[in-house]
From Swiss-Prot:
One Pfam match: Vps54
Cited InterPro entries: Vps54, Vps54_C
Phosphoserine PTM sites in chain numbering: 483
Protein name, per record: Vacuolar protein sorting-associated protein 54
GO MF, one example: syntaxin binding
Species this chain originates from: Schizosaccharomyces pombe (strain 972 / ATCC 24843)
Length: 949
């Protein structure tokens, strides 16, 4: 295109714009003279370098082809398809514009105040010759169609062509992938597809376009058309440029003023900012100070609360509210940690708090030690309190009745498992305190130690009280020394010193038994309570804290060890007392050792089998005592029978009771043997089983031993008493059965020998002080041997029934010895009467047979026989039945021998018949003899009858 002059020219026949119509004439003239088309293309603000632009006259005129106007309604189907996308785009565009305006609000405000014409602001930066005067409105984002404000019926100018349908536009322009860079689309749009592609060519040949002159010419024409349209557009906007330039100059001036003013404002603003910074720093400092003051107030308030709670903790410790104190200490620590986090202040590092924590440690240790001590004292106190619910006598009666040693009693043992609510609450609180202070193990260990000490003190206290019973009249120094002395030290001192130094020798059996009763039954009650306490503790630990439940194993051996402590104490006491045990009567020994056995059995029931030497020691002591008792009893009986006067004594009811028990024991154990009697006073020399010879209404002449009635002497009563003691001992201590059998046989063997020697031997007169041995002596000896035999058989059957042992050969041999000795006594009676009949019959040779009265010899024989009958009938009816017939037969034999020759003399026969008739009459009348008169019948028969006989 040819370059032409750049002189301004606006005579193109275009109508003037709205802006140029309102400009002042002066401004239009100056603008016309100064502005040119070239200046329109320069930067109106900063024209750094000139830009060459062609003028209108330099452009070759081109006839513009009219651009058809398509009505909006033709675009409605298309717009309807893109309505949603366009609505979203419009919404985003408006939001973006709004943000931009808000961001540059000051700039828009300054522009509104400037002298720029408002019409410039309403004019779009892009316009076409086809754009109508009114602006198109944005579509509503909520509507489905897009509408415009222009009227479809606006008459176009005369330079525009008639409306045509959009359907005449090729469809390629409406494709979604429309892009002129695509060669195929470009070929279709340029309508030269036939040039670039032949029918037999699959791909277009782009080189054909470069050589096609028609296409080149058409493209050139298109470019000219575009250029003209651009020039037209520029021409339409050229009227506003002078005003814009003027406004720009004014704007530049105002801008410089504004810049200066802004500079001053910036300086002031800087000063203000500096002052603001200073004020902000001051405010920050004040705020920091206020914040710190607030924090300080909170810290002080927290510390005040902490110290107030600490004071309450101290009061709780002082008042022994240990659980509240521990919870208070833990609460203080929790509050300190919580407040440290909330206030962002390490309160635990404060010196006052550190000092407070040290005090808490001291209080914590104090609470721990106090709770440990209180826990032990509380349980031991409950143990002692429970053991004193019943006194020692009531406990003794209950335990003896439980073991069937005395009749049943109405009272029963208190339940050891009954705990009141206060006790359970106190134990629960103590365990909580011990768990929180980690001192549960120490508390349980101390509890065990306290229990052991309590049992030691219990035995020691009763021991001291028992000694002081006998020492109450002694000096106070002695009583204090006894109270301070321990059992072990007393035991050692008693071994080194004489027996008189043993304080037990001065104690009566009643006092000693009472002391043992207190120790035994109080200890059993304490152990019963301890077992219940252990169950309660284990239950509480299992429910409360499973982690520390294993500590309950500490209490496993408490019962067994406690029983060992008690048994050691009482073993020491019994060892000390055993030095004088030989003087005890059997009833007292039975009472004491029954207490020992009851105590041991109850211990095994409560604590299981113990390993202590208590029961072996007790049984060894009992066996030693029994051996001494057996020896003493045998010697006493032997001495008694040796000094026996052999006089029948009246039988008192107590003696008959003794005989009944000895006789009945073979079938059933007498109740009196199984019952336990209270200990008696040691007055054996005066009152213990001393029987005076006295006759009362309750006394009988004989003692009934089953179906037999026997006369007894004083020594026989001693024998029955001894057998009664043996029966009691065996009823209570079946372990003594072997020693019992041996001792009893030795005793009967000794007595049998002693009686046999004294009654039948030659030393009777000298040993017993008798002037001569009479028939009653022999009769009572026979009765005594019968008593021996009956007692031996009954006691042996009792032993066999109780122990399950069979009778030994020694027992049978001893029984046979008694039978032999009894027969010897019968022979002794016959022998004595034989001597008597010999003396009497020596007078027969010198007698005169012509008198009518009995002779003196037959009268003497009758008197002797009657006297023997009376003695035997009174003292030994059994011997009377057996001996009198033998004596009569012996008399008949001797008289037959002496009188046979005399009876054959008829002159003497009447005298013989008178003597024999007198003899038989006296036997029948005085002795109750109902037998045949054999001798008289023989002498009355004829010689022939006698020869035949």
């Amino acid at each position: 295109m040819e370059r032409i002059s750049s002189a301004p020219s606006i005579s193109l026949g275009y109508p003037p714009t709205e802006s140029s119509a309102h400009l002042a004439p002066s401004f239009s003239d100056s603008a016309t003279s100064t502005l040119s088309f070239k200046s329109l293309l320069e930067d109106p603000v900063n024209p750094i370098r000139p830009v060459y632009t062609p003028t209108r006259t330099e452009i070759t005129p081109v006839t513009l082809s009219p651009i058809p106007i398509t009505p909006v309604r033709e675009f409605q189907p298309y717009l309807h398809e893109i309505s949603q996308e366009y609505a979203r785009y419009s919404k985003q565009k408006r939001a973006s514009l709004r943000r931009y305006l808000e961001k540059h609000g000051k700039l828009e405000g300054s522009m509104k105040e400037s002298s720029i014409n408002g019409s410039l602001l309403r004019r779009s930066s892009v316009s076409t010759i086809l754009r109508p005067a009114s602006e198109s409105s944005y579509p509503n984002s909520n509507s489905e169609t897009i509408t415009y404000d222009i009227d479809d019926n606006v008459n176009p100018s005369s330079s525009l062509v008639d409306n045509f349908s959009i359907s005449s536009v090729p469809s390629v322009f409406f494709q979604s992938d429309f892009n002129l860079d695509d060669p195929q689309i470009f070929d279709v749009v340029s309508e030269h597809i036939d040039i670039t592609q032949t029918s037999d060519a699959p791909n277009s040949n782009r080189n054909l376009l470069l050589n096609n002159s028609m296409l080149q010419e058409k493209i050139s024409w298109y470019l000219d058309t575009v250029e003209l349209h651009l020039l037209q557009e520029i021409e339409n906007a050229s009227d506003s440029f002078p005003m814009i330039i003027d406004n720009l100059k004014q704007l530049k001036k105002e801008t410089r003023d504004n810049v200066e003013e802004t500079k001053h404002l910036l300086e002031k603003l800087t000063e203000v900012n500096v002052m603001c910074d200073r004020h902000m720093d001051a405010i920050s400092s004040e705020e920091l100070a206020c914040h710190q003051l607030t924090q300080l107030k909170k810290v002080v308030q927290t510390l005040e609360d902490i110290y107030s709670e600490h004071k309450k903790v101290s009061e709780d410790v002082k008042d022994q509210r240990f659980l509240e104190a521990i919870n208070g200490i833990n609460s203080i620590v929790t509050q300190l940690k919580k407040k440290s986090t909330e206030l962002n202040v390490d309160l635990l590092s404060l010196p006052s708090v550190k000092s407070l924590r040290e005090e808490h440690k001291v209080l914590y240790h104090t609470v721990s030690q106090s709770v440990v001590q209180q826990f032990s004292k509380f349980l031991t106190s409950d143990m002692h309190k429970f053991s004193t619910i019943l006194d020692s006598n009531e406990l003794k009666d209950i335990y003896l009745s439980k073991n069937r040693l005395i009749p049943s009693v109405t009272k029963s043992l208190p339940s050891a498992m009954e705990f009141d609510a206060d006790f359970l609450h106190e134990v629960d609180v103590c365990i909580d305190c011990l768990t929180l202070t980690d001192s549960l193990q120490a508390a349980l260990t101390l509890y065990k130690t306290a229990v052991f000490e309590a049992f030691e003190n219990l035995a020691q206290q009763y021991f001291t009280d028992g000694v002081e019973m006998r020492s109450v009249r002694k000096s106070s120094d002695l009583r204090r020394s006894l109270s301070a002395a321990s059992l072990s030290s007393l035991s050692d001192s008693s071994r080194r010193s004489s027996s008189a130094a043993n304080p037990f020798q001065s104690m009566s059996i009643t006092e000693f038994a009472e002391m043992l009763t207190n120790i035994y039954f109080s200890s059993l009650e304490c152990l019963r309570r301890i077992r219940s306490q252990i169950k309660v503790l284990i239950d509480i630990l299992s429910k409360k804290d499973t982690k520390q439940y294993h500590l309950s194993v500490i209490l496993n051996d408490l019962m067994a060890t406690s029983s060992d402590v008690v048994t050691q104490q009482v073993t020491t006491i019994n060892n000390l007392r055993f030095r004088v045990l030989d003087t005890y009567p059997p009833n007292n020994v039975i009472y004491l050792f029954s207490l020992h056995i009851i105590f041991h059995n109850e211990l095994e029931s409560l604590c299981g089998i113990t390993q202590s030497s208590f029961i072996p020691t007790i049984m060894r002591q009992l066996l030693d005592w029994f051996k001494n008792f057996q020896r003493y009893s045998t010697q006493k009986l032997a001495s008694s029978f040796e000094r026996e006067l052999w006089e029948a004594i009246p039988v008192e009811p107590s003696c008959q009771d003794l005989a009944n028990r000895v006789f009945e024991c073979s079938g059933n154990t007498p109740v009196e043997w199984t019952r336990l009697l209270s200990p008696e006073a040691e007055k054996e020399d005066e009152n213990h089983r001393v029987h005076h010879v006295k006759v009362s209404e309750d006394c009988t002449a004989t003692v009934s031993f089953g179906k037999q009635s026997l006369h007894i002497v004083r020594s026989s009563v001693t024998l029955l008493e001894t057998l009664d003691d043996y029966g009691k001992l065996l009823a209570h201590f079946s372990r003594l059965a072997p020693e019992f059998q041996t001792g009893m046989l030795d005793m009967f063997r000794t007595l049998n020998s002693r009686v046999y020697q004294l009654i039948l031997g030659a030393g009777t007169v000298r040993s017993s002080g008798l002037s001569k041995v009479l028939g009653k002596h022999i009769a009572l000896a026979s009765q005594t041997i019968a008593l021996f035999q009956l007692s031996l058989n009954s006691m042996c059957r009792y032993l066999s029934r109780v122990t399950g042992t069979r009778l030994t050969n020694e027992t049978n041999k001893l029984d046979q010895d008694f039978t032999v000795h009894h027969l010897q006594i019968h022979d002794k009676f016959v022998s004595l009467m034989r001597e008597r009949v010999a003396i009497s019959c020596s007078q027969i040779a010198s007698l005169s047979w012509d008198i009518d009265s009995p002779h003196g010899y037959i009268i003497d024989l009758s008197k002797s026989l009657i006297k023997l009958y009376k003695v035997l009938h009174r003292y030994s009816q059994r011997d009377c039945v057996e001996v009198i017939p033998d004596v009569i037969r012996m008399f008949e034999d001797r008289l037959q021998l002496e009188l046979t020759d005399i009876a054959r003399n008829p002159s003497k026969w009447p005298g013989v018949r008178i003597d024999l008739s007198y003899f038989y009459d006296m036997m029948a009348s005085k002795c109750g003899y109902a037998g045949d008169r054999t001798l008289l019948e023989k002498f009355e028969r004829t010689p022939e009858q006698q020869e035949a006989a």
